[in-house]
C-alpha cells in the first residue's frame, strides 16, 4: 500500500505541466499576431498620410479656383445690375409724358401690336413692362413719343350712342366678334365688339356705346327712362272696392278672367281669347279702378287654381302713362312701346298674368292723318298694332286701354282681333250713386248723436238714410241743380243738370268735403260726428267749383270728353244760381282737328 502511492504522484504532476504549456503557447501566438498587425499598420501609415496630403492639396486648389470664379461672378453680377438699372431708367424715361393714346386692335407673335391712334391704324412695338397676352380687344393703350405701347388702360366711356341690330360672324383672322349697328341717322355700320360687351348678352334694339373712328362698340347704354313711364305693381284694389259698375265688371271678368282660368274650355270650343279690352267713357267713372281690380282678381284666382296661398298671389299691372310716353326724338316712342311689351313677355313667361294698361289711349294712338303739326301717330300706331298681334302667342298677357275720346283712337286698334271687347263706363245713375256712396260712408264712421237719435241709435239705418238723402239732393231736377243750357247746331236747346255730369270721383270728393267739415266742427264745437248737413253743404260746394269749367274750352270737344254725344253743340250758357256769371257766350266750333283739348 505504501509503495503504490508514491508511484502515482509523478503522473499527475506531468499532466498539469502539459496543460500550462499549451495555455502559454496560445498567449504567445496572440501576442505575435498583435505584433504583426502593429508592424503592418506602421508600414501602411506613411502611405495614408501621403494620400491625405494629396487630397488636401487638391481641395486647396479647388477652393482657390472657386474663389477666383466667385470673384468673377460677383463682378459680372455687378455689371449686370448696373446695366439693368440703366435699362430700367431708360424704360421709365420712355414712359414719361407727353404720351398719346390709342385703341388696341390685334397682337402678333413677334411682340408687336396693331393700334388705332391719331386717326390711323399702326403696327407698333410693346414695352417690356406691358404683358401683350393681357391686352384685350378695344382696350385703351398709352403710347410714348416713339409710338411704343407703355401702359394698358381701361375701355372708353364716351362715344356715339348707336342701336344694336345683330351679331355678325366672327372675323376669321382676328377671331373677334363683330356687330351691325344703326347710327343716329339710321346709317348701318359694322363695328368690332369688345369682349365685355360680347359677354353681356346683346339683344336687338339695345343701345351701345360706339367709337366711330376706331370702329369699336364698348358698352351697353342703360336707357331705362321707360321705367319712369311704367308702374309695375300688384294692385290692391278688388271688385268690392268699386261701386255702381256691376254690369261692366261682369263683362270684363268674362273677357279677361275666363280665358286665363279656363283655357282648356276655350281650346275645346276652338274659341280665341280676346287680346285687348277698351274701357271708354267720361272721366272719373272708374276705368282705371276696374283695370287694377282685374289684375288683383286674376292673381288671386290663378294662385287658388295652383293651390298657392293668397299671400303668394302674384300678377303684374303695367300702368302706361300715355302722354309721357311721347318723345320728341324720332323712334324713341316706338322704342318705349317695344320695351314695354318686351317686359310684359318676360313677366308672362313665368306663368304670371300680366295686364298692360294704357291710360289716356287717345293721346298717343290717335287716328293716323289727324295731326296738324305732327304725324307721329303714323309710326306709333303701327308699332302698337304689331306688338298686339305679337301678343297672340302669349297666354298671360292682355292689353287694356282707357280713353275719354274713343272716337279719336285709330280704327285699326279698335277692330276685332286687337281690342276685341269694348266696354262703356257710364256715369252713375241714382242706384249706382248709392252703391258708390256706401263705399265711402261706412258704418265705422262716427255719426253725430242728433242724427242717430232720429233712428233710435241704429248706426246702419242712419248711414243708409244719409246716403238716400244725399243722392236725392244730387239727382233732383230742381232749379238749384240746373247746370247748363246747351244749344245744338240744329237750334234745339237742352237743360243739363249736375246729375248729368256726376261721377265716382265727384262722389268721393263730396264725401271727403263732408268729412273735413265734420273734423272742423269737432275742433270748433267739440261735438264729434258726421251729419247730413255736412253732405248737403259739400254738394253745394262741389257744384260751385264745377260751374266755370265748361267755358274753358271748345264746347263740342268738352261735351265729347264729358260723355255727351250727338248733335254738335254751338252754344253753352251756365245756369248756376248765386254766382256772378255772364249770360253765356257763343263759341264757334271749328272742324274737328283731332287735337286733344
Curated annotation (Swiss-Prot):
Gene Ontology cellular-component annotations: proteasome complex
Biased composition (Basic and acidic residues): 1-12
SMART domains registered for this protein in UniProt: AAA
Residue numbers spanned by region Disordered: 1-22
Entry-linked PROSITE patterns: AAA (PS00674)
Top-level taxon of origin: Bacteria
Pfam families: AAA, Prot_ATP_ID_OB_C, Prot_ATP_ID_OB_N
Pathway assignment: Protein degradation; proteasomal Pup-dependent pathway
Keywords linked to the UniProt accession: ATP-binding, Chaperone, Coiled coil, Nucleotide-binding, Proteasome
Binding site residues for ATP: 284-289
GO MF annotations in UniProt: ATP binding; ATP hydrolysis activity
GO biological process, one term: proteasomal protein catabolic process
Family annotation (InterPro entries): AAA+_ATPase, AAA_ATPase_domain, ATPase_AAA_core, ATPase_AAA_CS, NA-bd_OB-fold, P-loop_NTPase, Prot_ATP_ID_OB_2nd, Prot_ATP_ID_OB_N
Docks into pockets in the proteasome alpha-ring: annotated segments: 596-597
Coiled coil regions, renumbered to chain: 21-97
Cystine residue pairs: none
Domain commentary: Consists of three main regions, an N-terminal coiled-coil domain that binds to protein Pup and functions as a docking station, an interdomain involved in ARC hexamerization, and a C-terminal ATPase domain of the AAA type.
Role description: ATPase which is responsible for recognizing, binding, unfolding and translocation of pupylated proteins into the bacterial 20S proteasome core particle. May be essential for opening the gate of the 20S proteasome via an interaction with its C-terminus, thereby allowing substrate entry and access to the site of proteolysis. Thus, the C-termini of the proteasomal ATPase may function like a 'key in a lock' to induce gate opening and therefore regulate proteolysis.
Assembly description: Homohexamer. Assembles into a hexameric ring structure that caps the 20S proteasome core. Strongly interacts with the prokaryotic ubiquitin-like protein Pup through a hydrophobic interface; the interacting region of ARC lies in its N-terminal coiled-coil domain. There is one Pup binding site per ARC hexamer ring. Upon ATP-binding, the C-terminus of ARC interacts with the alpha-rings of the proteasome core, possibly by binding to the intersubunit pockets.
The family this protein is said to belong to: Belongs to the AAA ATPase family.
Protein name: Proteasome-associated ATPase
Taxonomic source organism: Saccharopolyspora erythraea (strain ATCC 11635 / DSM 40517 / JCM 4748 / NBRC 13426 / NCIMB 8594 / NRRL 2338)
Organism lineage string: Bacteria, Bacillati, Actinomycetota, Actinomycetes, Pseudonocardiales
Amino acid at each position: 500500500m505504501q509503495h503504490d502511492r508514491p508511484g502515482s504522484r509523478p503522473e499527475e504532476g506531468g499532466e498539469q505541466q502539459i496543460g500550462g504549456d499549451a495555455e502559454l503557447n496560445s498567449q504567445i501566438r496572440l501576442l505575435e499576431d498583435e505584433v504583426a498587425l502593429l508592424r503592418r499598420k506602421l508600414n501602411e501609415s506613411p502611405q495614408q498620410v501621403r494620400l491625405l496630403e494629396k487630397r488636401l492639396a487638391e481641395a486647396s486648389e479647388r477652393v482657390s479656383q472657386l474663389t477666383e470664379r466667385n470673384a468673377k461672378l460677383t463682378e459680372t453680377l455687378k455689371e449686370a445690375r448696373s446695366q439693368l438699372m440703366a435699362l430700367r431708367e431708360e424704360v421709365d424715361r420712355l414712359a414719361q409724358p407727353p404720351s398719346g393714346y390709342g385703341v388696341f386692335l390685334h397682337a402678333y407673335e413677334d411682340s408687336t401690336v396693331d393700334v388705332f391712334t391719331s386717326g390711323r391704324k399702326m403696327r407698333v412695338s410693346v414695352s417690356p413692362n406691358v404683358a401683350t397676352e393681357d391686352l384685350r380687344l378695344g382696350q385703351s393703350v398709352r403710347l410714348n413719343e416713339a409710338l411704343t405701347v407703355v401702359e394698358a388702360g381701361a375701355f372708353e366711356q364716351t362715344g356715339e350712342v348707336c342701336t344694336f341690330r345683330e351679331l355678325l360672324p366672327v372675323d376669321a383672322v382676328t377671331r373677334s366678334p363683330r356687330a351691325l349697328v344703326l347710327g343716329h341717322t339710321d346709317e348701318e355700320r359694322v363695328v368690332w365688339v369688345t369682349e365685355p360687351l360680347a359677354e353681356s348678352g346683346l339683344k336687338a334694339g339695345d343701345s351701345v356705346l360706339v367709337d366711330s373712328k376706331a370702329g369699336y362698340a364698348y358698352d351697353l347704354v342703360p336707357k331705362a327712362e321707360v321705367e319712369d313711364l311704367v308702374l309695375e305693381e300688384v294692385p290692391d284694389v278688388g271688385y268690392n272696392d268699386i261701386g255702381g259698375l256691376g254690369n261692366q265688371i261682369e263683362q270684363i271678368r268674362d273677357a279677361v278672367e275666363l280665358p286665363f282660368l279656363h283655357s282648356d274650355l276655350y281650346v275645346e270650343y276652338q274659341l280665341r281669347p280676346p287680346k285687348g279690352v277698351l274701357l271708354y267713357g267720361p272721366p272719373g267713372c272708374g276705368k282705371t279702378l276696374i283695370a287694377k281690380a282685374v289684375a288683383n282678381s286674376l292673381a288671386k284666382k290663378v294662385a287658388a287654381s295652383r293651390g298657392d296661398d293668397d299671400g303668394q298671389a302674384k300678377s303684374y299691372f303695367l300702368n302706361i302713362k300715355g302722354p309721357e310716353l311721347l318723345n320728341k326724338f324720332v323712334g324713341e316712342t316706338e322704342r318705349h312701346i317695344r320695351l314695354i311689351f318686351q317686359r310684359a313677355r318676360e313677366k308672362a313667361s313665368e306663368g304670371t298674368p300680366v295686364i298692360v294698361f294704357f291710360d289716356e289711349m287717345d293721346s298717343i294712338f290717335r287716328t293716323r292723318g289727324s295731326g296738324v303739326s305732327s304725324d307721329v301717330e303714323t309710326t306709333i300706331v303701327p308699332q302698337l298694332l304689331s306688338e298686339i298681334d305679337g301678343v297672340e302667342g302669349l297666354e298671360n298677357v292682355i292689353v287694356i286701354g282707357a280713353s275719354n275720346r274713343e272716337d279719336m283712337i285709330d280704327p285699326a286698334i279698335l277692330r276685332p282681333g286687337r281690342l276685341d271687347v269694348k266696354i262703356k263706363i257710364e256715369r252713375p245713375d241714382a242706384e249706382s250713386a248709392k252703391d258708390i256712396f256706401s263705399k265711402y260712408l261706412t258704418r265705422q264712421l262716427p255719426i253725430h248723436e242728433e242724427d242717430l237719435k232720429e233712428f233710435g241709435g241704429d248706426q246702419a239705418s242712419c248711414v243708409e238714410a244719409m246716403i238716400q238723402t244725399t243722392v236725392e239732393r244730387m239727382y233732383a231736377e230742381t232749379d238749384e241743380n240746373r247746370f247748363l243750357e246747351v244749344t245744338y247746331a240744329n237750334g234745339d236747346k237742352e237743360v243739363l243738370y249736375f246729375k248729368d255730369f256726376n261721377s265716382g270721383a265727384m262722389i268721393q270728393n263730396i264725401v271727403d268735403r263732408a268729412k273735413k267739415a265734420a273734423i272742423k266742427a269737432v275742433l270748433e264745437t267739440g261735438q264729434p260726428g258726421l251729419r247730413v248737413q255736412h253732405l248737403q253743404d259739400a254738394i253745394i260746394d262741389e257744384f260751385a267749383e264745377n260751374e266755370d269749367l265748361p267755358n274753358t274750352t271748345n264746347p263740342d270737344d268738352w261735351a265729347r270728353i264729358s260723355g255727351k254725344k250727338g248733335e254738335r253743340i254751338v252754344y253753352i250758357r251756365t245756369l248756376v244760381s248765386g254766382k256772378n256769371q255772364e249770360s253765356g257766350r257763343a263759341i264757334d266750333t271749328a272742324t274737328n282737328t283731332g287735337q286733344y283739348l
